[in-house]
Design a protein with these regions (language model features):
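Peripheral/terminal regions associated with large enzymatic or DNA-binding modules
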Residues: 2-65, 69-362
Length: 362
């Protein structure tokens, strides 16, 4: 499989110029894409258009990385091999732990998949995104006259219009750093990867791992409560942006509350979580992970056998990574700093109990 030429750029603002230069040097990226109007109203799209125009002559694909990330030295190698495997796809290498797409990645990890199709009713994670050069040019033409400030929202609109959302790398080798935001996202609190993974594990998974095209309905959490992203909800009047509490969504999932409530929450594990975050959050995390386990078990049955060359131990570490982020990601943003090592261990133990209980539901 010949590796394509992938050019690259780091999106940045003058206030983070040194940080961006260090990132570009460490990762051997081609250069920086500076905000052309740094004194203007904050606009990620304005800088993104510069970044997507920075395609090197002869490149077949172009990678745009934002300046507030960390990644291993192997990033370009991993991206290049992924582009060779999926030459016509938009490939996303970071997924937010608290978003619907993060929940899709978490579900896919538990199912044993290495890639998952992004949902159409949410922004496209754009901290590390690779496009075929034709796609980069088409996006620039599409976005050039837009009044939208957020490139991630416009990318989703662009992909929806083309009838194919991006592919999310389930193992995340790219990590967001810090909570400051030039584009007013700091209120979302600590924002990290859904499934952080080492380059050594990610490389074979992304090279040969399975693709989950349709995960079905997707459980996710926001502000300490459980929700379900329903199949086809993007066709609603609000474009699918509404949020369905898990109880309200059950009829559309084919499950009953009686079935969901049948497994008993482990009191000792719930008490440990509730000690810091309250009984209500402990119960919501339990239900969320139970639904996650149920859907992951269903998805796993649709994936077929594990391909040759996919290390089972790497897949198992990916599963553990996915479950470990479920609790902290599900907390309200203002409570996430309270999740120290002991609290994280307690949430992970309860999350795993929920996932395992859910595997036999429905």
């Amino acid at each position: 499989m010949p590796k394509p030429h992938v050019s690259s750029a780091v999106m940045t603002h003058p206030v983070r110029l040194a940080q961006a230069q260090d990132l570009a040097t460490r990762l051997r990226l081609d250069g920086l894409a500076l905000d052309p109007d740094p004194q203007g109203q904050p606009s990620a799209l304005r800088t993104a258009l510069v970044a997507w125009a920075a395609v090197a002559p002869g490149a077949g694909h172009h990678l745009v990385v934002q300046d507030d990330v960390d990644a291993p030295a192997e990033l370009l190698e991993i991206v290049g091999r992924s582009a060779a495997r999926f030459p016509d796809e938009a490939l996303v290498f970071y997924t937010n732990w608290h978003a619907r797409n993060g929940a899709a990645a978490r579900l896919a990890a538990l199912a044993g998949a290495s890639w998952v199709r992004a949902v159409p009713d949410e922004f496209t994670p754009s901290l590390a995104l690779c496009l075929p050069v034709e796609g980069a040019a088409a996006f620039r033409a599409y976005a050039r006259d837009s009044a939208e400030r957020h490139d991630d929202e416009l990318l989703s609109a662009f992909f929806r219009g083309r009838g194919r959302m991006s592919l999310l790398a389930v193992p995340n080798v790219v990590e967001h750093i810090g909570t400051t935001s030039i584009n007013d996202h700091a209120a979302q609190g600590i924002r990290l990867a859904a499934c952080p993974t080492s380059a050594a594990d990610a490389a074979p998974l992304l090279d040969r791992g399975r693709v989950l095209e349709e995960p079905g309905w997707i459980p996710y959490m926001r502000y300490g409560e459980g929700y379900v992203r329903l199949v086809g909800q993007e066709n609603g009047a609000d474009g699918g942006r509404g949020h369905h509490r898990w109880r309200d969504a059950l009829p559309a999932t084919g499950l009953t509350e009686e079935a969901v409530r049948a497994p008993r929450i482990p009191k000792d594990l719930a008490t440990e979580v509730a000690r810091t975050f309250g009984d209500a959050f402990a119960e919501e995390l339990w239900i969320h992970c139970l639904l996650l386990g149920r859907q992951a078990a269903r998805a796993a049955r649709s994936l077929g056998p594990l391909p040759d060359g996919v290390p089972p131990d790497a897949l198992e570490r990916l599963r553990h990574s996915a479950v470990a982020t479920a609790g902290p990601a599900g907390l309200p943003p203002e409570r996430r700093p309270e999740a120290g090592p002991d609290e994280a261990r307690a949430m992970t133990a309860l999350a795993w109990a929920g996932v395992r209980a859910g595997e036999s539901v429905g």
